Amino acid sequence: MVKRTGPTDINLRRLIRTLRKKSNEEGVKIWKDIAWRLERPRRQRAEVNISKINRYTKEGDVVIVPGSVLGAGRLEHKVVVAAWKFSEAARRKIIEAGGEAISIEELMERNPKGSGVIIME
């Protein structure tokens, strides 16, 4: 049996630690859930296309993706998307639609309680 080590990326480990700390400080479980989802192996981490974000959101929604946002599809309304990584095409399409592509840390600062945030995988 191989010992489970978790992510080796130092920045990701720091983010997971910060998410857990914020969860305990604020008494909110959403950040602990996001930390758990980011801790999974890379092959099991979320990869969400722009088309899926467009399909399941409406104008003004806030979405968090515990993984990567990819650029397939079109975005037809403004949304705020927070994710671990964005492809160049995805970031460009979100900004062209009038939305924002931000980091998970930035979303934690803006909305410490995590209210109204949609988790998308």
From Swiss-Prot:
It holds the Pfam family Ribosomal_L18. Keywords: Ribonucleoprotein, Ribosomal protein. The keyword Coiled coil does not apply. InterPro entries: Ribosomal_eL18 (IPR000039), Ribosomal_eL18/eL18-A/B/_CS (IPR021132), Ribosomal_eL18_arc (IPR022947), Ribosomal_uL15/eL18 (IPR021131), Ribosomal_uL15/eL18_sf (IPR036227). One of its GO terms (biological process) is translation. One of its GO terms (cellular component) is cytosolic large ribosomal subunit. GO terms for molecular function: RNA binding; structural constituent of ribosome. The keyword Lyase does not apply. Part of the 50S ribosomal subunit. Belongs to the eukaryotic ribosomal protein eL18 family. HAMAP family: Ribosomal_eL18 (MF_00329). This is Large ribosomal subunit protein eL18. It comes from Thermococcus kodakarensis (strain ATCC BAA-918 / JCM 12380 / KOD1). The gene is rpl18e.
